Amino acid sequence: MPKSGAHQPLVRHDTDDGGETGQSVKSLADVSEEEIDSRMSRRSSVIADLLSLFRRSSSVLVRPHTRLGNPNFDDDDDEFDEEDDKEASKDRILKKIQQKKEIIQKLRGQPWYMKRKRRTLKVAQKHLQQQEAKVSKARLYKAEAGRRLTQASRWLDNLKIYLIPWEAKIRKIESHFGSVVSSYFTFHRWVLGVNITITFIMCMFVVIPEWLADSRTQFGDDRYNKTKAIKVMPPAVRARADELSTVWDFGGYFQYSLLFYGFYSKETFFGETIKYRVPVAYFFCNIFILGFSLFIILRKMAANNRRGTLSSGKTQQYLFNWKAFTGWDYTIGNPETAGNVYMANVIKFREAINDDKQKPSDKHPWIRFVARVLTNLFICAMYVFSIWAIMQCGTLKGEHFFAQNATAITISLITLVFPNIFDLLGKIEKLHPRNALRFQLGRVLVLYILNYYTLIYSLMLQLEHLQKEKNASDNPISALGHPGDAIGRTIRETVLPRYPVDNNPHTYYSYAPVTTTPIPATSSWTTVLPDFGPFGVYNPKASVTKDDTVFSSPVVETHMFGPNSDWNETTVNAASPTGATTRASLRMSQGGLCWETIIGQEITKLVTMDLYMTVASIFLIDFLRGLACRYLNLYWPWDLERTFPEYGEFKVAENVLHLVNNQGMIWLGLFFVPLLPMLNNIKLIILMYIRGWAAMTCNVPASQIFRASRSSNFFFALLILFLFLCTLPVGFVIASKTPSKSCGPFGNQSFFYSVITDVLHENLDKTLVNGIKYSLSPGIIIPVLVLLSLVIYFLIAMVTGLSQANQDLSFQLMVERTEEKKKIFELAGGKKKKSKDNTFGKQKPKQLLPPPTKGVSSDDDSQHNRSTAKSVSGRQFVPSLGSVSEVDHSTGEEQSSDSESTTSSLPPKLSLRQRFLVCIGWADPNKYGRHDDIEMEEGGGRLRELSTGSETDSDDEDSEKSNRDMSYRTAIQSFDQNSQSASASSSKSTTTAPSNSEMRIEITENPLHTYITPLRIEKKSSASSSSSSHQPSSSIEKQAARRLLQPISTTHNIRYGVATVENSSQDPTRPPSTDDSLGDPALHEPLWANLNPHSSYTSAMMSPIMNEVMSNDETTDDEKGRLIPDRPPIPHSPRELKRLKREKDQQSESGSKPSTPRPPRFRISMSPPRKPPSEKNDSDSSNRKYEMRVEKSPKKPKKSDND
């Protein structure tokens, strides 16, 4: 063999025109090093340098061009000289130009002398100029522009990674806690992006137009006078606007700002060129945001679902393998987290094993049942207490802090404390860890939903109470009359004392004279037309006048006369009741109740209170507990880090539910607080940093891993649920409630949606508006909803049917693939005689074949003998046919044919779910039994095909052999000339009686077909003939493998000859030795798998890829591409077919072998024989080395002459 690293020359076989005898050729071993050096000396050093640079080029996707011209071309020609190749396309030339430019760029970094670099650069530039001359300048500029654009896009993609917010922080958390914890922060960032989008929409279409309209309003304008009551802060409110209680309740400056619903006016904004209706924009933006949120969530879920469906169905078959190979998180970089994940995987395997095993019966099941019942009763009691507490907080009245913020504080405490109590109660139930996590999530979700709707109900009750108070305040308390409407009169009753003589009492009345003073008129009367007011305004709503008239009343003086000493003074005590004073909103005192702002203030306080409670809980529960566990552990009686209270866990599921609940509050309060998403953005940013700091400082990964990556749509399903829950109260308010008359953009409407009808009336015809009203009536909407429900049901049924059909097709493909693999492995390792036919996991009765008679072809016998497999112990590469089945045989226990027939006659037993589906009409009751019958029939059909495959006639068997061995016709060698006569005589008669002889193969190959003929070799003794009758027919393939794997010799007779096996006990599969003999008994019989020509090992060794792997030469890709010639052309013309037929007839008449066949493209040569296996030397040691060389096919063979 040549030395490693040298360029090995090609081996050429020179044949004469007649093809009678082949001249001797040189083998690879006969090529001297001087000849190799002489060939290498003809190669230019500059070209070698360019080749080395070209071999290191980054353009690896460009495949080298294979020259298909004359096979006798010189391999040492200039590889870059392609000027004569006029058939090259422009794209190919551009690729070559790009390659040469890369070579020039890499030339500077090569460790060469400067003279060598300059010389190489000169040659490369010259070739580059030649190639560029073949392409127009515009094409070059276009290619260069495309390349620069690709580089710019890659640079932008790399820059985009640095622009993603908190990407580095999330990756750091991922390295410490894994992808499960980082998925929460990724979801947190996604929710923040949604809130930023919602804020942008509300600011662009609602907030900014209202702010522009107010900025253009001046003091005394019509808009200023109409909006003064809702936009100008009264002096009494301004005096308390800076107090902490006012700011905490979002009053004062917050109340009279763009933050709440009541600040927006119902006036139309008249710009310089446009007329913008803010109420219409307010209504449509809220509806659009809800629809937009639903769309992006569904879009994200669909994308995750598409990625999830790419996984194969094998994940449901090999559960433990998938758990083992996919259970590790390779993003972890923290040893502590790695230990937690390791233990989690161990627990996961234990759980899976326990699930598969039969669960033992519980000794005391009633104790567990009672504990679970009590636990669920206690949890239900907690739900009732939560509802009662929220309802009671809504009825509290008072001026103190707790009364004003009772609802927000109560909901925040319940949200914070109750999930931890649920977790403790769940441990009493002793559920499976996976089920315990599911129950925990379900209970927390139910708690959030109850709190959500209890809050809405409490707010509605407060609204009704305030509405009643407002209606009571509308009644007049006192009536003030005009001063000129009554005449003042003073009456004095005097009781005179009785004189001593005459004690008769007398009563005297005195009347004060009343004088009337004329009042001059300060203003003249104005004549007003019926349709116009006093100011010339059309159809005024109200008119306010001011009267400065001064009234003067007469002064009446009374004087007491007569003695008063005998008057008796009587004191009368009278108590007048005083009414209770209640705190009312300023909007109510100004003539109306703005209940939308009140609800918005409550929701805003709830959102901000949740932020305060979350930060406080992180600081107290996580941070202080972590400090105590860290620094008090040395002085405590037990281990604080491992028992109680231990470090806080980062609970992904609870944190996700908390985030989803917060987003539901945002969707609920968006209609009443347009800038609530902006406040939520600030809250989410604060929580991102707080939770990230707590995770890296105080928390440890949860012991029970929440697999969010396996069900990535879990987060978004919760968002969909809360979005649906928040649309119900908002829709109820829009459809049934009456807007406030004193504030908001819908103050002059009877309903919130009336603003749409007003716009339609103003811009459309009355007939068209009436048609729209009729189309939106309940008589049309209800049938449409029913129709949509039926369509949805039909689509669901269709999708279910398609999914079932998809599963059936996947199962069929799996079965077909399994059968094909079985056939391939049978061809690779020899057909194995099946004592038990195992199809679809069920045992079939053994089919006994009758013994062969004299009229049966020997090919059938050889086929049956070939199916007999020897022991597979010790084999290295022969796979087991039982392990290739991809069907999950979970219930494939062995059953007899009698039990199968009995079971098939009985109706299938349906589960509870199947009965329910059959009851509601979603499933066919016959499909369950019919599906099994179809599988049994298909399995039986395939079994009959496999069992009767060996009983076909000899013609079908020969065609099957020839088709199977077509792929090996370039590798299997022919036999020598000495066995041609015997092979010709035996090939003429195919149906002969079997005799005590040994079988061997003759391979006759022409450009169209490959003929495989079994031959018989008569034994020299009767004893040997009797033993040879029982010799397995796999020795035929062993002989072919021996001819294939024998060392390369210098003559055709040795190379294509065949040695007759004289003794059947001699192992024909032993490796070749230095004396070209196959008698070395070192190779054990099980290693026949490596020598089988149909085995996958031999196929792999004959593949062209092994030429690159096993060879030690350093030839370039271009050189290797030229080494593989095209296959010989298949003749199609009548002349060629006649010539081939004539050659065949001549060969059959002469009884001789045709001319020397075309040499194979591949040759496998082996090193010296393998050593016997030992402790130091394994049977698969690297001493055995396979090398494959590609040879050139000779010229087109001409017509051969017979001897």
From Swiss-Prot:
Q: Looking at the keywords, is Endoplasmic reticulum present?
A: no
Membrane topology label:
Multi-pass membrane protein
Output the superkingdom of the source species: Eukaryota
Output compositional bias ranges, type Basic and acidic residues: 927-945, 1133-1147, 1172-1203
One short Pfam name that applies is TMC
The record's InterPro entries line, in alphabetical order, gives: TMC, TMC_dom
Residues that carry a glycan: N225, N748
Major place of residence = membrane
Which residue stretches does the UniProt record annotate as biased composition, category Acidic residues? 73-86
Which keywords accompany this UniProt record? Glycoprotein, Ion channel, Ion transport, Membrane, Transmembrane, Transmembrane helix, Transport
Keyword Transmembrane, does the record have it?
A: yes
Annotated spans, Disordered = 1-39, 64-90, 826-908, 927-1039, 1059-1087, 1112-1203
Q: According to the UniProt entry, which residue ranges have a biased composition of type Polar residues? A: 865-874, 1061-1076
Gene Ontology annotations for the cellular component aspect, listed alphabetically: plasma membrane
Question: Where's it found, cell-wise?
Answer: Membrane
Transmembrane feature ranges: 191-213, 276-298, 369-391, 406-428, 441-463, 665-687, 714-736, 780-802
Q: What does this protein do?
A: Probable ion channel.
The record's PANTHER family line, in alphabetical order, gives: TRANSMEMBRANE CHANNEL-LIKE PROTEIN 2, TRANSMEMBRANE CHANNEL-RELATED
| Protein name (record) | Transmembrane channel-like protein 2
Source organism of this protein record: Caenorhabditis elegans
